[in-house]
C-alpha cells in the first residue's frame, strides 16, 4: 500500500517587524481618531442669498441712479456692466448694498479691493448654516459675536452678516487706512451702528493675538487670506485676469451704450486692485493658513468655530493635517460652486459636539 504524503503548506513570507512609530505618527494617528471631519459640496447660491439669477438692473439703478451710465447690453440684449471697468464694478457694489442691505453710504479708497458680493454672501450663509446645526430649533443669531480677520476697507463680511442675521462683528486689519474706511462705513449707516467694532492689528506677525482679549468670546471667525507670496506675483495675477476679461469681451462682442466708460490701461483697476496686505504675504496663502491654525490653538476655548476661505485647493489637505496634529476635534470643508467657479472654506473647532452645545448655552 502506497503511503500518501500530505502536501506541504506553502511557505508564508516572513512578517516584517513593524516600524517603530515616531512621535509625529503617534500624535497624528491619535488626533485623527478623535477628529470629526466632514466635507460637503454645495451647488449654486444658498437659498437665502439675495443675489439669485441675473442682476435686477431696474431695481439697482432705482436704488443708485448713478449706476445707469455704466449699464451695457450683452449680445443677448440683456443688461450688464463691463466687469473690466473698475468704476462700473464699484458702482454695482454701491447699488447692491443700497438696494439689498440698506447700506446707502458705502465707498472705498482708490486701489482697494472691491469684492464680488454674491460669493461673499454665500460664505456668510454657509457659516450661519453651520451654527444652526449646533442646536435644535431656532438658532439665536442675534446673540452671535463674530470676528473678521482682514476686514479690509470694504467691510463686506460684517455688512452682510449684520444686515441678514444681526450678528455683532469685530473687524481687524493690519492696514490703518482700511480700518478708517471701515469705520466710516459703520458710522454713516444706521443699520451698522453699534454692531461693528474695528480694531487695528499693530503686530503684523500675529493674527488673533492682540485682537482677541482674555474676556472675548466669538461664535465664529471669518477670513479671506492673502493669496500671493509677493507683490510681483500679485501684479502678474491681476494682469492675467485683465487679459482674460479682455479676451472674453472680444469673443462675446459686448458693446457699451453711449455714455458708459471704456476700459483704459491708465485707469485704476479697483475690482482687481488691492493693497499689499489684501493680496500677498510672505510665503503666500499656505504660510498664512499655517500661522492662523497654530495661533488658533491659543484661543481654543474662546472661539466656537474658526474659519477661513482657502483659494488654492491644494492647501486644504495640509491645513487639515496640521489641525489634526493640534488636537482639533471637528473640521468642516465646505465647497461652494457657482457655475464654473468653485470656492471653499475650512472651519474647525477644538470642541466636540457636546462641548459646543454647552458653550452655546453658556454664552447664547
UniProtKB/Swiss-Prot annotation:
Keyword Transferase in annotation: yes
Reactions accelerated catalytically: adenosine(1618) in 23S rRNA + S-adenosyl-L-methionine = N(6)-methyladenosine(1618) in 23S rRNA + S-adenosyl-L-homocysteine + H(+)
A Pfam entry, by short name: Methyltransf_10
Listed InterPro entries: METTL16/RlmF, rRNA_lsu_MeTfrase_F, SAM-dependent_MTases_sf
Principal location listed in the UniProt entry: cytoplasm
A GO CC term attached to the entry: cytoplasm
Localization in the cell: Cytoplasm
Keyword Amino-acid biosynthesis applies: no
Region (Disordered) location: 1-30
Keywords: Cytoplasm, Methyltransferase, rRNA processing, S-adenosyl-L-methionine, Transferase
Enzyme superclass (EC): transferase
Any Gene Ontology biological process: rRNA base methylation
EC number: 2.1.1.181
GO molecular function term, any single one: 23S rRNA (adenine(1618)-N(6))-methyltransferase activity
Protein role: Specifically methylates the adenine in position 1618 of 23S rRNA.
Family, as annotated: Belongs to the methyltransferase superfamily. METTL16/RlmF family.
NCBIfam families: PRK11727.1
Protein name: Ribosomal RNA large subunit methyltransferase F
Species annotation: Vibrio vulnificus (strain CMCP6)
